[in-house]
Amino acid sequence: AMRALGATLVEHGDDFQAALGHAQVLAAAGGLHAMPSFAPELVLGVAVSALAFLREAPPLDTVFVPIGLGSGICAMLAARAALGLRTRIVGVVSAAAPAYARSLAAGHPVSVPATTRLADGLACSTPHPTALAAIAAGVERIVEVTDEEVAAAMRAFFHDTHNVAEGAAAAGLAAV
């Protein structure tokens, strides 16, 4: 679809971090601006959706938020704080890409291989330090889900709601 719209699509590496590193090299070589996957502007934009979700939902005890590089969960943490809510936020990572879970336990960024094949939006091998600090300050805990659990959640979404969810989007349901 991206090529059909005229984009040049470059695929590189085995995980998100490898692709990101290559994109940064290409941007620098071409004099292009590369929007980082974790940036304050991006977190603010995502927080608009998180604010709308938390305002429109009935009072929630807990929200399960998938963690890729961290912008989504940081946005949810910011929205919760802005609204003064007590909602617990639980981060969800792939058991095959547990960098944020390992880093939270260690108290500092820990790099681990990201080998998930189903939830590629969770395929983070090295946490962003700013995201990790925000997560550590506000998350209830981080849980790990297997690709099999994600696949079951994807099937449940399709069977129960007639919607197709990609792996990272189904991770929150897989964690419940």
Q: What residues fall within each predicted segment?
A:
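PLP-dependent amino-acid enzyme catalytic core
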Residues: 1-176
